[in-house]
Amino acid sequence: MWRCGGRQGLCVLRRLSGGHAHHRAWRWNSNRACERALQYKLGDKIHGFTVNQVTSVPELFLTAVKLTHDDTGARYLHLAREDTNNLFSVQFRTTPMDSTGVPHILEHTVLCGSQKYPCRDPFFKMLNRSLSTFMNAFTASDYTLYPFSTQNPKDFQNLLSVYLDATFFPCLRELDFWQEGWRLEHENPSDPQTPLVFKGVVFNEMKGAFTDNERIFSQHLQNRLLPDHTYSVVSGGDPLCIPELTWEQLKQFHATHYHPSNARFFTYGNFPLEQHLKQIHEEALSKFQKIEPSTVVPAQTPWDKPREFQITCGPDSFATDPSKQTTISVSFLLPDITDTFEAFTLSLLSSLLTSGPNSPFYKALIESGLGTDFSPDVGYNGYTREAYFSVGLQGIAEKDIETVRSLIDRTIDEVVEKGFEDDRIEALLHKIEIQMKHQSTSFGLMLTSYIASCWNHDGDPVELLKLGNQLAKFRQCLQENPKFLQEKVKQYFKNNQHKLTLSMRPDDKYHEKQAQVEATKLKQKVEALSPGDRQQIYEKGLELRSQQSKPQDASCLPALKVSDIEPTIPVTELDVVLTAGDIPVQYCAQPTNGMVYFRAFSSLNTLPEELRPYVPLFCSVLTKLGCGLLDYREQAQQIELKTGGMSASPHVLPDDSHMDTYEQGVLFSSLCLDRNLPDMMQLWSEIFNNPCFEEEEHFKVLVKMTAQELANGIPDSGHLYASIRAGRTLTPAGDLQETFSGMDQVRLMKRIAEMTDIKPILRKLPRIKKHLLNGDNMRCSVNATPQQMPQTEKAVEDFLRSIGRSKKERRPVRPHTVEKPVPSSSGGDAHVPHGSQVIRKLVMEPTFKPWQMKTHFLMPFPVNYVGECIRTVPYTDPDHASLKILARLMTAKFLHTEIREKGGAYGGGAKLSHNGIFTLYSYRDPNTIETLQSFGKAVDWAKSGKFTQQDIDEAKLSVFSTVDAPVAPSDKGMDHFLYGLSDEMKQAHREQLFAVSHDKLLAVSDRYLGTGKSTHGLAILGPENPKIAKDPSWIIQ
């Protein structure tokens, strides 16, 4: 996977927070792993390594142990923490000097087989032989990273063995280079009369990556700002340069870069360090001697005067104003990222300058009305040896470029003169405190990503983690010098000659020109071929296709057994209490480390149909327009000072036992430090009772930003949009899902953003509020520590008593609704007093008839996103478990080969969603009709039963790695709260998964997937297609 450096440019605040994944077993009452690690001493010799440093980092609840390998100089960092989700990564400094994508293609190819594991594609095969919680690889601008995580010690050793052998002893076969990188091959490999074309997984991945205008801008920004060395090229590969790479160059790059002396090893979690060191030394490092790698990235020579560049990109078919598609940014080179305190300071300074409606650049640029959103890579970017800061606007008219530049200069001058309000600095430091306390499930992955760039350039990763020290030093600097931050702005922005102004405008013929350049390159390559070369290409194509089609013997790979899977799920204890009369509140006591997580779910059943499309917009702006006596700026300030965020999002929740029944509503989510709980609940009270819908100008700004973000997200999420549309007509919930989250919503937001008079839309918001922001049809959930619960119950009760209730009961808009009690989650009524359980009010459509719809969304992309959906059965039906295993089996044993290896798409597969929709999909795919045919062949393959018990067991392991993914303390009990799933229901489903057999898989593949057995929906996002255009059964949009 390629990481465009600029796209990862998040400040320290976001890089350590870790998202909303799941976690399973946290034991914060014990710090055994940390205490064990503190027993190591400086100079200790362990399995060929020497301990260099042992440091406690209490703010992150971990102990850091730094080591060096004696014979090779390989560096090692172990972060001991009482977290069962253990992670390993190995990182190499990879510094390409051209845009052939050599580090990226190498990252793909090393995972295709190694000396100890010579079978083809051990990486993808291990996905099905492991209970890993994460497995992947990333190519950044100047390093390549190979991480995995798992909760199982035996699994950790298995995966470590595969990763070590892959990275240090790969086969690097020529056919694997052809498949993963690029090749010349006949359009139909078995027919030498068909034309020769470029193929390859990375080739197509990068063609897809550069359909994204933000990516194009980010890449050029880095290339132009840092032009002297490796940052001047595209590490992932420019599709027009990739065909210049040879197999010999690939092998040479591995020999010079993938050596222990150029490696950094990282482990995290509660598994013992000694076992890791022993295995790494014995299986890999003992076979090498130290070398001096010549991979150091030199400092960029500073400029003596600013520079300007103009570039072009493809048109945005979702632009709210076709005459406003220009992007401009001004960027400044900053100091070396290994100066950790300066990097920390500039990261915070960046947030003060650009984050939220109170920031100077938001006021000057976003609220100017000149553009739709900040330019890509806005803020601090610390992923290159020297960091950079960038700010600008996208969605502007070309004539406004100079205006934006002068606004940026003027804003810098104003900040130098006036500085920042104390409250904004406090809000920022409060945010860091929250993110140090918030426990994510993928914390090891967050940490390895956070330290990767600094460590890559020989900075001290442990110093980077000591956020407490840096915060204290930051406060001290501010105290000693109130103009500390203003002086930094003056030094790095006002007086900095290393300043780049980059502008990008659309060219209607951009993709056409790219295609012409590719065609010219192809023509040159083909014309240079001798008859012998052509014959060899044809034979190699047949050989590759033959190899891809052969059954693979993966017996050399280590594997867990189904018996290694835990037979039962851990019990989650919940209390449900009726509060303020009849509102159920679910309390889940968890080790949340002084944090409180509050959520509320409010039904949309009484909302008139014509208002439903506007619910996502309502949710997006609800916490951003002001409330009570607070205007939107004051509200933003209070939210940052008192909470870790407050948000609302529309949800369509399937019923667990009926396909035509669902729940519709809005989920309100928030988190805070326990000391701020009354303030957070008071903010919710004001938002519910007195939201402000009068700020027309700010509403316009928010609408434009939302529309721009949706349009920008299509290239990365095209397969999801295709799948949502394909499932639209299969269930009643599918249509609502399309309205809330599909291409319909993208297009609606585009239309709203284009409106000259936005008042009619603004007037809809109070109407939605009447149906949504009250105590009718609401339920709440709280996750906090047991000690916090009494205070929490009082604050939640005060909030619920403060919000309005309808004077008379509103009737649901849909005539058929059913009240469904949610079963208690921990057996019987032990934790749920009689009459206190959650009642879900579901919408039922008894007369619904699914029907087939085929949609082709025309997009100016050179690749496609394909989705086919099939209606099957709900969660509690025993067949649901069999279909879940079947989807994994079809992906691993058939679709991966057909769609990725043979077809050249970046990704593809099958999945069964909780709502009973079975989806076949592809991602960044050069094909359409051929992919749909592959979906059909996959069904035929499943019905033929050509899979073994070993295949079924591997599919079960893969499914259970998802089912048993870790759940964070903040998210425990959410399945029960949102979906009504009790522990007993989940255990029953677990037993159904264990019981899936060959016969059951054959039965469900025939019963649901065969032609004419169930209703199918199809959708494609991509360029024009003559075959589809001629087929009247397709709707083209």
From Swiss-Prot:
Needed co-factor(s): Zn(2+)
Effect caused by changing E185A: Loss of metalloendopeptidase activity towards an amyloid-beta peptide derivative
Regulation of protein activity: Mainly exists in a closed and catalytically competent conformation but a closed-to-open switch allows substrate entry into the catalytic chamber. Substrate binding induces closure and dimerization. A disulfide bond may lock the enzyme in a closed conformation preventing substrate entry into the catalytic chamber, participating in redox regulation of the enzyme. Inhibited by metal-chelating agents. Inhibited by nickel and zinc excess, and slightly activated by manganese.
Impact noted for substituting K199 to A/D/E/Q: Decreased metalloendopeptidase activity towards an amyloid-beta peptide derivative
Function (record text): Metalloendopeptidase of the mitochondrial matrix that functions in peptide cleavage and degradation rather than in protein processing. Has an ATP-independent activity. Specifically cleaves peptides in the range of 5 to 65 residues. Shows a preference for cleavage after small polar residues and before basic residues, but without any positional preference. Degrades the transit peptides of mitochondrial proteins after their cleavage. Also degrades other unstructured peptides.
Connected disease: Spinocerebellar ataxia, autosomal recessive, 30: A form of spinocerebellar ataxia, a clinically and genetically heterogeneous group of cerebellar disorders due to degeneration of the cerebellum with variable involvement of the brainstem and spinal cord. SCAR30 is a progressive disease characterized by childhood-onset global developmental delay with variably impaired intellectual development, motor dysfunction, and cerebellar ataxia. Affected individuals may also have psychiatric abnormalities.
Full protein name: Presequence protease, mitochondrial
Protein source organism: Homo sapiens
Gene encoding the protein: PITRM1
